Amino acid sequence: MKVVAFERQQQGTGASRRLRNAGKTTGIVYGGEAAPQMIELDHNALWHALKKEAFHSSILDLEVAGKSQRVLLRDVQYHPFRQLVLHVDFQRIDPKKKLHTKAPLHFLNAETSPAVKLSSAVVSHVVTEIEIECLPADLPEFLEVDLSKIEAGQSLHAKDIALPNGVALTAHVDAENPVIASATIPAGAVSDEAAAGEGETPAA
C-alpha cells in the first residue's frame, strides 16, 4: 500500500494548527540508520486509509520527496471528539531484522461449531489482535482463528492460533497465553432449559 507524504519544515503547536487548517496532518518517520524526518500528509486521504485494516497491519511504501521507504504505522493520535487525525508515527523497516507488531484476528466458522449448533452458545471474541514477531517479508495481514470445533464452556487461547511459517507470538504473549475467544451459554437459555426439565413428568 502506497502513502504519499511531504517534507515538513515548520514545527511547533502554531505550525501544526496552520497545517490542520489547510487540510494537512503532521507526522514523523523514524528508525533505521536515517535521522527522524518530519512529514505532513493530506488529512482526507489519511482518514480514509486509516479505515482500512491493512493500513494498520501491513508494510507501507511511504513516498517523501520522490523517495520511497518501507514503514509500519506505529501510532495515531486522534482529536478527542472531532473526526480529526492530529498526528501519525511511522517506523522504518529493516528487511533483515525481526519486527514486533500486532496482527488482526479474523474469527471463522463460529456458526458451524458445536457450541452454537448444539448448545446455542454465544461465541465471544475476547481480543481482536495479537502481538507477533517476524521478519518483514513474513508479516501477515491478519491471522485466522478457526472456531469450528469450539464447544460450550470452552475457550481458545493465543497458542491455539495456527501461525504461518516464520511468525511467532511475542515472548510475553507466549508466556501468558491469553484467552482470545470463549463460548458461553446465555443465562436465560440455562434457566429455560432448567424450567423445561422441571416441567417434565417422570415416567411411571
UniProtKB/Swiss-Prot annotation:
SUPFAM superfamilies: Ribosomal protein L25-like. The keyword RNA-binding applies. Keywords: Ribonucleoprotein, Ribosomal protein, RNA-binding, rRNA-binding. The keyword Amino-acid biosynthesis does not apply. GO terms for molecular function: 5S rRNA binding; structural constituent of ribosome. It comes from the Bacteria. One of its GO terms (cellular component) is cytosolic large ribosomal subunit. One of its GO terms (biological process) is translation. Pfam families: Ribosomal_L25p (PF01386), Ribosomal_TL5_C (PF14693). Coiled coil: none annotated. Part of the 50S ribosomal subunit; part of the 5S rRNA/L5/L18/L25 subcomplex. Contacts the 5S rRNA. Binds to the 5S rRNA independently of L5 and L18. Belongs to the bacterial ribosomal protein bL25 family. CTC subfamily. This is one of the proteins that binds to the 5S RNA in the ribosome where it forms part of the central protuberance. This is Large ribosomal subunit protein bL25. It comes from Burkholderia mallei (strain ATCC 23344). The lineage of its organism: Bacteria, Pseudomonadati, Pseudomonadota, Betaproteobacteria, Burkholderiales.
